């Protein structure tokens, strides 16, 4: 019964998990460094993953520990902060595997004793209360767990852990299918969803019962495993025996010893005693002789057990004396242990486990635990056993060597002492019995010499690039001779048999030509011209929505001497007459303007004063609106004084009222003080005596007597009655505290008053002027400043400068996303106007989807990949030379996951100066230093060009560069400009649900910190406090430690920068904040940690996360924010479906609200009116026909007018009936006029989600994510910026620079993508400069620990990716060989090769990259893409054109060259140009394997789901294609293995011989005095490129040729592994050897054409699926165009088949 319950429920759990697997996100786990996401690793999952690793052989302990440590070090190097958890119950799963019990125990001890990793072993099970509490306290972001165990029962244990983690809102990361590169670890993430929590709540009892049943079953395993070996001995008896053995050893070896010796002698002695007892229990009677005899054929004698123990002791002595370098050369014995040996070995493993379980209890004993990782080496044991039973008996007698022999005798004699119960044999001979321990095999020793090892050596190549880049290492490399078969068999440039009519060498059109031209730039067609005009009009309209800057007309200027704007200008000694007249005129004009403004104020003053009396707040708004438009200081002073008088009056009235007597509304007092601030700061010089008296009186009324006295000292002392009377108006707190606590967001910022003639729209800050100076001096700069701080202005100034200099200079703006490209293009077109020569335009765009005016514009806006295409295009160099400046926006993408290396290429290829902008870089100094080194390189190159130019001029020849290129003298300096101050403060709030309503609790930034964090890292540099939060911090410090020495000094009223200060400024508040932070830090450093901890705890909010599904409360959250006047807001979620669903849920909420308000008969009336309207329309149409035929015009005109009037009336009534009430929409109807609204809606009429977005927009709602078309995104962006939309849900697409400022930002979904970087980018949108004085950030359904980590985590450091690929090398050689300007081309190529960020200041990495470059050349030459001089040939153009898809591009061309596509693409009948559906489907199958690779987790294969439309799992490649792919992969791996063997010389062998994490070394002097050691360790060949630890499992270099070999078998310090080999796996396996199937989404869609089918069966998100299919369709189209260009035969079957497929696929895609 129990088993049935367990089976049924476990199947239900398993199905739930399997159902989630295809939806798993395969993504990078780490983006943060320093206190990043805290996560957990299930220790048993880690153990299972490593022992099931393909390269690992059971019993090789040291290799196992190396795998564990290498994995953990990889996590740590990527910023991982984790704890490893071993549950006590998990041990039950190993009772059938005693060898793993001891390995697990050793692993736990090793991690605890020899590393700093936090290891937890106290939790009994995942269902325990302690575990639940731990999860609540630490809130790990995810748990790494295995999806499959060693057997079904262990798999069920893992399933319980997964289900429980989900129930606790902890995400799960699968240990299978993980891949790692230089910066990222990619894994399958299964997020915790509400449905998982529901499942756990519903099945709470079932889960408990099933878990108990499972444990009972595992407990029975323990008994059944022990009984046959230990008989009646119980668990506790054996434990006691083990304890006694160790205790006895402490007496024998009181001085202590090494764990390997201790483990050896104790486990051997316990094994012998247990086996002795085991044999005794088998004796038929007690009266027999004491000599033990074999009871039956399955039971070996005690002597055989002794022999095994002797061999084990000798093995351990080998471990003690042989360094890893020698052990890594051990012979590989392939024989297995004989069947009769199994009981002995099982018992020995159990004894080892019991010894290890007890060893840590002897902590007082001097036991060295360093070598816990090296207790067993089964391969070495087999080697020794093989020698003694196969070689020694045949007459091969080899000495052990004195040292080894002595140590062995010492160990065996100790075993003898520990046994005591009976006599054991002498140390020698080692074998006294003749039973074979190993099975007999024909070839028991693996012969590596028979394995195929590629011929070491490079093909000779001669090229300028090769010599310049890798020339210094060529002399040390082995090269093949010219008569070597590899060289003589090189593919010559010839026409391939299958491709007779193909011109493979013909230059292809590049990506620029391919990308869709939005309109023909040279066309004179009126329709085209009209579409161009419409486009430019819309762009200006779009640009106008981005900013309210008037367009500037640019006029090209002649080059003048530069002015220095930073210093003061010297006055002239004498003014000319003209200057005097001009000055007088200006004065007169100013006086006239002032008079007008005074008249205007006189006209408005009465109404504003009345408004101030009726409603102070609306009156203040009108007053401030007037102040914004007024320029006269005198008039402004009058207005401010009126405002101050009104505010004081309102305050006095309020204090006298009943309400004011109980609780005072301090917002009125804030308005009083705000007016005083304004008067004192801006108009201090204009104030009269009466004005000062009024201000002083106001201060007295507020209770700030000291401030009043300092401003206007009282002449007469006031009597007590007056003082008492005035006390009732006092705010009750000191002026400093009042200003900080209640006026923080109003505090005046220190801004410069002096305008800069270079900028008209605003007065730039000092740091912004520094940027302008950079541009003026033609310098480069890295600019790091917060979001919305104004760093982009430097970009537009840079553009303006280039536009003014000439008509042909170009500035390139590189943006990371298409959304940002569209936005910047619109801004440029709105900002600047310029009359240019015919054919030239001001602004152009180039993205992969479309382009316009890209090469005939002066400002090009593009994405990195497209700019790289232009820089690497051999025939675009003349255009590239026109570039004067490049602006890189969001340059931190250099450290991203996808396309990061492209940013590197661009930064090193450009010769001109650049601006690199970012809000989030934590190591800008390192980045700047690297970029400066690149600029020094270009300085040298430019000098060479100048010298060449001079010599060419001397001989009368033209220079290669435009004349003005060298005239505009650029600087090679790279400046770093840092600015850390946000204009607006951000305050954070946590949302919680109480009694069905949403509550907000303020989250103080210090609540995110711990004393440990402050001690280790200090306060994060960008963790700032608002003035109110500074006061809260002081109050908390004072409350916790009232007698703290500096309490009075840091009291707000006494603080040095506030003391008796009337106007406290923002900078003063910042100084106070810094003082408090420094004081709290000193508390921690001076031993007052507990007080500091209590302060931080005191600042934490009390709100708890609600257990319910908070996303269902999302509409309520939005409604609450509206009531609090916190809209417009951006709501960030991280799944496309969630973004759309959240927006839809808010719309549904408003619709339901409207329905409850609609009168009962409203729908019926609307229906009646709609019917009437239809009839009237018909009547009007009929009347028109009658009018055309009839002669009686007058009567007909009257009839028409009546119909039209009725029509208009009905339309108005119907509109009124259907009108959305104001409280049922979030749209601000006043923000946008109807015409603008219709224009925006009109653009999305034919878009996929157009109608849906329009319906949402009418309610003031929108959504924004990557799968939307750019027109759909523009609708949301424009209407949000104009204020019409006030609720927008979005993914991280808005984080990268898109200009959508708002009042509030809400994080409404936890995700792996919500990291420190994205948090800063997204939260930076809150608080619109000039509109909001403060920004608000809300956390909705984000756990407290996660919030803390987001606030305190540093942003990622920028670190270099692996910079090279085979296709990049081909593209570089193509540029060097075919470039229009060979010198410039070669300089660019060398810059890319020499200046990767990865190799900066890393000479060893540079040497490795040089070798990788040579490996790439070797492959390209062999495959016929390059000749031996480095010139492109064959299908080099097609391969480089498909560079996005390496290695699929290389495989595709090899299929083409081998004629496989010609064999496949056979038409339905001879002479036909049409291909059958079967041919098309096979073609899609092949292309899906190449360009549509999306893997399922391996465990999903076990699922038994019914699929309705899709096949889901992609079939294998057709046999001929599969064979060709295997051949291609073998060629690649042969070359790559050669490369790895050569590059292994660069390895740091000191590091290679130590464990990566614990740094335990296995080095030492090799043993040379032992003949046996020399004999056993004789396998030195073929073990050069792989780690010596990996060699312990019998691996060789030739294993690298096998595609299933894991990436990390290679040497760790060479900086490259097998993932850099461009192989394309026909079948992919995880590290345990399980097959990972491909998702057949592309082929399934081609068959059924349904996105819904992909959502239901293929488990894809609709938006993701559409995006992937579009990408697939673009690739097919690109290939189709390339093939058409390369083939001169119009009727070639392959070309026709691809054209048919492209057309059909696009037709299907356009229908969805």
Curated annotation (Swiss-Prot):
A motif (DEVH box) lies at residues 889-892. Residues 772-939 form the Helicase ATP-binding domain. One of its GO terms (biological process) is response to virus. It holds the Pfam family Helicase_C. Gene3D superfamilies: P-loop containing nucleotide triphosphate hydrolases. GO terms for molecular function: ATP binding; ATP hydrolysis activity; double-stranded DNA binding; double-stranded RNA binding; RNA helicase activity; single-stranded RNA binding. Its EC number is 3.6.4.13. Positively regulates RIGI- and IFIH1/MDA5-dependent type I interferon and interferon inducible gene expression in response to viral infection. Binds ssRNA, dsRNA and dsDNA and can promote the binding of RIGI to dsRNA. Exhibits antiviral activity against hepatitis C virus and vesicular stomatitis virus (VSV). InterPro entries: DEAD/DEAH_box_helicase_dom, Helicase_ATP-bd, Helicase_C-like, P-loop_NTPase, PIN-like_DDX60, SKI2_subfamily_helicases. Belongs to the helicase family. Brain, lymph node, prostate, stomach, thyroid, tongue, trachea, uterus, skeletal muscle, spleen, kidney, liver and small intestine. Induction: By interferon (IFN). Up-regulated during vesicular stomatitis virus (VSV), or poliovirus (PV) infection. The gene is DDX60. Interacts with EXOSC1, EXOSC4, RIGI, IFIH1/MDA5 and DHX58/LGP2. The keyword ATP-binding applies. Residues 1226-1370 form the Helicase C-terminal domain. ATP binds at residues 785-792. It catalyses: ATP + H2O = ADP + phosphate + H(+). This is Probable ATP-dependent RNA helicase DDX60. The lineage of its organism: Eukaryota, Metazoa, Chordata, Craniata, Vertebrata. One of its GO terms (cellular component) is cytosol. It is found in: Cytoplasm. Keywords: Antiviral defense, ATP-binding, Cytoplasm, Helicase, Hydrolase, Immunity, Innate immunity, Nucleotide-binding, RNA-binding. It comes from Homo sapiens (Human). It is an enzyme of class 3 (hydrolase).
């Amino acid at each position: 019964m129990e088993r049935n319950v367990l089976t049924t429920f476990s199947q239900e759990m398993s199905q739930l998990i399997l159902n989630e697997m295809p939806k798993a996100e395969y993504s990078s786990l780490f983006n943060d460094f320093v206190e990043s996401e805290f996560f957990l690793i299930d220790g048993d999952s880690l153990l299972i993953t490593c022992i099931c690793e393909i390269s690992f052989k059971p019993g090789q302990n040291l290799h196992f520990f190396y795998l564990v440590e290498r994995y953990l070090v990889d996590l740590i190097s990527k910023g991982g902060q984790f704890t490893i958890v071993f549950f006590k119950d998990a041990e039950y799963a190993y009772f059938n595997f005693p060898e793993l019990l001891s390995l697990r125990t050793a692993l736990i001890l090793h991690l605890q004793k020899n590393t700093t990793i936090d290891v937890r072993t106290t939790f009994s099970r995942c269902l325990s209360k302690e575990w639940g509490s731990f999860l609540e306290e630490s809130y790990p972001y995810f748990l790494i767990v295995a999806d499959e165990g060693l057997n079904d029962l262990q798999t069920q244990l893992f399933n319980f852990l997964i289900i429980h983690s989900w129930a606790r809102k902890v995400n799960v990361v699968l240990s299978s299918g993980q891949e790692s590169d230089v910066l990222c670890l990619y894994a399958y993430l299964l997020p915790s969803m509400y449905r998982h929590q529901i499942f756990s709540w519903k099945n709470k009892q079932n889960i408990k019962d099933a878990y108990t049943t499972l444990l009972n079953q595992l407990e029975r395993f323990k008994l059944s495993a022990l009984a046959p070996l230990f008989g009646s001995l119980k668990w506790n008896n054996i434990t006691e025996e083990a304890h006694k053995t160790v205790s006895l050893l402490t007496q024998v070896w009181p001085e202590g010893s090494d764990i390997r010796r201790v483990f050896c002698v104790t486990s051997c002695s316990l094994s012998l005693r247990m086996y002795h007892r085991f044999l005794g229990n088998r004796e038929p009677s007690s009266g027999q002789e004491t000599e033990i005899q074999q009871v039956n054929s399955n039971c070996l004698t005690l002597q055989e057990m002794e022999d095994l123990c002797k061999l084990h002791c000798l093995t351990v002595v080998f471990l003690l004396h042989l360094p890893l370098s020698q052990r890594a050369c051990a012979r590989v014995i392939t024989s297995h242990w004989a069947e009769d040996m199994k009981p002995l070995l099982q018992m020995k493993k159990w004894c080892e486990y019991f010894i290890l379980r007890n060893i840590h209890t002897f902590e007082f004993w001097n036991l060295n635990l360093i070598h816990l990782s090296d207790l067993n080496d089964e391969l070495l044991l087999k080697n020794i056993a093989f020698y003694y039973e196969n070689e020694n008996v045949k007459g091969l007698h080899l000495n052990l060597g004195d040292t080894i022999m002595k140590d062995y005798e010492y160990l065996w004699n100790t075993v003898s002492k520990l046994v005591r119960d009976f006599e054991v044999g002498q140390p020698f001979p080692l074998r006294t019995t003749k039973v074979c321990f190993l099975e007999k095999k024909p070839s028991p020793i693996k012969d590596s010499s028979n394995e195929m090892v590629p011929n070491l050596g490079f093909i000779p190549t001669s090229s300028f690039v090769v010599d310049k880049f890798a020339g210094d290492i060529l002399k040390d490399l082995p090269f093949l001779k010219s008569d070597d078969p590899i060289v003589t068999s090189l593919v010559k440039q010839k026409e391939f048999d299958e491709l007779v009519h193909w011109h493979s060498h013909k230059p292809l059109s590049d990506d620029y030509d391919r990308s869709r031209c939005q309109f023909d730039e040279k066309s004179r067609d009126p329709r085209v011209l009209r579409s161009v005009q419409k486009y430019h009009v819309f762009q200006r309209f779009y640009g106008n929505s981005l900013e309210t800057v008037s367009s500037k007309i640019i006029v090209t200027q002649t080059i003048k001497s530069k002015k220095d704007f930073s210093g003061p200008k010297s006055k002239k000694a004498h003014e000319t007459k003209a200057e005097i007249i001009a000055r007088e005129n200006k004065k007169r004009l100013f006086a006239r303007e002032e008079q007008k403004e005074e008249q205007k104020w006189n006209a408005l003053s009465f109404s504003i004063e009345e408004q101030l009396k009726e409603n102070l707040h609306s009156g203040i708004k009108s007053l401030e609106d007037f102040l914004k438009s007024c320029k006269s200081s005198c008039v402004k002073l009058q207005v401010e004084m009126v405002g101050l008088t009104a505010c004081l009056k309102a305050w006095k009235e309020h204090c006298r009222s009943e309400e004011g007597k109980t609780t005072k509304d301090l917002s009125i007092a804030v308005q009083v003080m705000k007016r005083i601030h304004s008067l004192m700061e801006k108009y201090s010089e204009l104030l009269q005596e009466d004005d000062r008296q009024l201000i002083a009186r106001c201060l007295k009324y507020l209770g700030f007597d000291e401030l009043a006295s300092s401003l206007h000292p009282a002449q007469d002392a006031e009597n007590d009655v007056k003082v008492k009377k005035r006390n009732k108006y006092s705010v009750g707190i000191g002026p400093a505290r009042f200003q900080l606590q209640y006026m923080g967001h109003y505090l005046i910022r220190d801004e410069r008053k002096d305008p800069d003639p270079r900028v008209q729209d605003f007065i730039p800050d000092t740091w912004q002027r520094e940027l302008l100076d950079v541009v003026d001096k033609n310098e480069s700069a890295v600019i790091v400043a917060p979001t919305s701080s104004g760093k982009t202005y430097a970009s537009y100034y840079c553009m303006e400068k280039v536009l003014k200099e000439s008509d042909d200079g170009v500035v390139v703006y590189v943006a990371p996303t298409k959304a940002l490209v569209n936005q910047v293009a619109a801004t440029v077109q709105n900002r600047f106007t310029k009359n240019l020569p015919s054919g030239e335009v001001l602004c152009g765009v180039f993205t992969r989807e479309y382009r316009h005016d890209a090469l005939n514009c002066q400002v090009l806006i593009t994405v990195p990949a497209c700019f790289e295409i232009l820089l690497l295009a051999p025939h675009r160099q003349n255009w590239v030379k026109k570039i004067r400046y490049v602006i890189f926006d969001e340059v931190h993408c250099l450290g991203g996951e996808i396309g990061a290396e492209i940013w590197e290429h661009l930064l090193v290829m450009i010769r001109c100066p650049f601006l690199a902008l970012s809000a989030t870089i934590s190591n800008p100094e390192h980045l700047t230093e690297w970029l400066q080194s690149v600029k020094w390189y270009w300085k040298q190159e430019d000098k060479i060009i100048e010298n060449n130019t001079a010599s060419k001029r001397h001989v009368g020849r033209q220079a290669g560069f435009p004349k003005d290129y060298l005239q505009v003298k650029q600087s090679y300096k790279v400046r770093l400009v840092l600015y850390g101050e946000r204009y607006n403060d951000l305050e954070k709030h946590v949302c919680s649900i109480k009694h069905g309503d949403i509550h907000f609790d303020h989250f103080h930034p210090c609540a995110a910190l711990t004393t440990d964090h402050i001690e280790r890292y200090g306060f994060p540099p960008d963790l700032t406090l608002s003035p109110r939060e500074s006061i809260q911090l002081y109050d908390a410090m004072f409350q916790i430690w009232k007698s703290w020495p500096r309490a009075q000094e840091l009291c707000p009223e006494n603080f040095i920068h506030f003391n008796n200060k009337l106007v406290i400024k923002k900078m003063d508040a910042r100084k106070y904040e810094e003082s408090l932070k420094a004081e709290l830090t000193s508390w921690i450093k001076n031993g007052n940690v507990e007080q500091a901890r209590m302060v931080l705890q005191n600042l934490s909010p009390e709100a708890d996360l609600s257990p319910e599904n908070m996303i269902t409360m999302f509409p309520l959250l939005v409604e609450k924010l509206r009531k609090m006047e916190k809209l417009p807001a951006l709501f960030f979620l991280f799944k496309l479906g969630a973004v759309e669903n959240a927006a839809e849920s808010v719309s549904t909420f408003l619709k339901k609200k409207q329905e409850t308000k609609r009168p009962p008969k409203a729908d019926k009336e609307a229906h009646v009116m709609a019917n009437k309207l239809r009839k009237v329309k018909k009547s009007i149409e009929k009347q028109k026909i009658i009018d055309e035929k009839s002669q009686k015009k007058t009567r007909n005109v009257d009839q028409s007018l009546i119909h039209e009037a009725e029509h208009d009336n009905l339309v108005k009534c119907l509109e009124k009936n259907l009108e959305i009430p104001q409280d049922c929409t979030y749209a601000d109807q006043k923000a946008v006029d109807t015409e603008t609204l219709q224009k925006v809606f009109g653009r999305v009429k034919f878009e996929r989600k157009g109608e849906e977005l329009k319906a949402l927009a009418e309610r003031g709602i929108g959504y924004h994510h990557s799968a939307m078309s750019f027109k759909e995104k523009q609708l949301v962006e424009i209407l949000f910026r104009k204020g019409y939309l006030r609720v927008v849900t979005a993914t991280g697409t808005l984080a990268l620079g898109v200009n959508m400022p708002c009042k509030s930002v809400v994080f409404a979904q936890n995700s792996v993508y919500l990291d420190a970087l994205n948090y800063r980018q997204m939260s930076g949108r809150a608080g619109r400069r000039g509109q909001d004085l403060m920004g608000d950030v809300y956390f909705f359904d984000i756990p407290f620990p996660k919030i803390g980590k987001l606030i305190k985590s540093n942003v990622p450091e920028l670190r270099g990716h692996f910079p090279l690929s085979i296709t990049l090398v081909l593209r570089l050689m193509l540029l060097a060989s075919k470039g229009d300007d060979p010198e410039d081309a070669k300089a660019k190529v060398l810059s890319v090769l020499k200046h990767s960020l990865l190799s900066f200041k890393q000479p060893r990495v540079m040497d490795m990259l040089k070798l990788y470059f040579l490996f790439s050349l070797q492959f390209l030459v062999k495959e016929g893409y390059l000749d031996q001089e480095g010139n492109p040939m064959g299908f080099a153009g097609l391969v480089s054109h498909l560079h996005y898809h390496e290695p699929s591009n290389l495989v595709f061309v090899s299929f083409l060259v081998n004629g496989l596509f010609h064999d496949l693409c056979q038409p339905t009948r001879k002479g036909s140009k049409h291909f059958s559906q079967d041919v098309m489907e096979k073609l899609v199958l092949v292309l899906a394997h190449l360009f549509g690779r999306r893997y399922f987790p391996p465990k999903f294969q076990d699922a038994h789901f019914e699929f309705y439309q899709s096949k889901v799992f992609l079939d294998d490649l057709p046999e001929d294609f599969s064979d060709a792919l295997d051949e291609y992969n073998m060629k690649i791996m042969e070359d790559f293995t050669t490369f790895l063997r050569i590059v292994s010389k660069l390895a740091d062998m000191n590091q290679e011989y130590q464990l990566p994490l614990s740094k335990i070394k296995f080095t030492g002097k090799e043993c040379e005095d032992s003949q046996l050691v020399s004999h056993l360790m004789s396998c030195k060949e073929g073990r050069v490129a792989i780690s010596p630890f990996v060699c312990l499992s019998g691996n060789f270099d030739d294993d690298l040729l096998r595609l299933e070999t894991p990436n990390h078998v290679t040497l760790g310090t060479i900086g490259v592994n097998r993932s850099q080999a461009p192989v394309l796996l026909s079948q992919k396996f995880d590290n345990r050897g399980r097959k990972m199937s491909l998702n057949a989404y592309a082929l399934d869609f081609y068959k059924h054409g349904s996105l819904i089918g992909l959502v239901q069966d293929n488990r894809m998100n609709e938006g993701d699926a559409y995006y992937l299919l579009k990408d697939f369709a673009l690739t097919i189209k690109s290939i189709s165009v390339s093939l058409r260009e390369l083939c001169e035969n119009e009727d070639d079957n392959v070309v026709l088949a691809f054209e048919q497929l492209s057309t059909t696929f696009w037709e299907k895609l356009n229908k969805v």
